[in-house]
């Protein structure tokens, strides 16, 4: 399973980020052996995604699955959105969403916007 994440530079609520990952993990099928997080930034989102992957690695391994953090550019994620199974966008209230949110919805990717 491939999860795309992106957010705004002002977003700093790690608990909401964890909730977004819990929602994505709930879609992980039994036959899925990989959980890859493609993070399109900015840096604060990349750091949350990397921390989540590092902290979850042991638990995932015990379940016979692997987790991997991959930093990508927003352009790359937009161009390769069809490879993504789930997309999460994280922002504070009243902040605009990125173009990737619209592109992922147009491509019927399960898209969630978290703005708390």
Describe the role of every protein-language-model region.
Residues 10-116:
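Acidic/glycine-enriched connector segments
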Residues 2-12:
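STAS-typified acidic loop motif
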């Amino acid at each position: 399973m491939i999860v795309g994440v992106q957010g705004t530079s002002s977003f700093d609520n790690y608990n909401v980020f964890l909730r977004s990952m819990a929602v994505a993990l709930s879609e992980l099928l039994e036959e899925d052996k990989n959980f890859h997080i493609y993070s399109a930034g900015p840096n604060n989102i990349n750091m949350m995604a990397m921390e989540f992957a590092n902290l979850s690695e042991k638990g995932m391994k015990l379940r016979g699955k692997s987790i991997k953090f991959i930093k990508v550019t927003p352009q790359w994620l937009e161009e390769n959105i069809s490879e993504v199974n789930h997309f999460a966008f994280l922002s504070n209230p009243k902040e605009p969403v990125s173009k990737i949110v619209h592109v992922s919805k147009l491509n019927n990717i399960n898209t969630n916007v978290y703005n708390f």
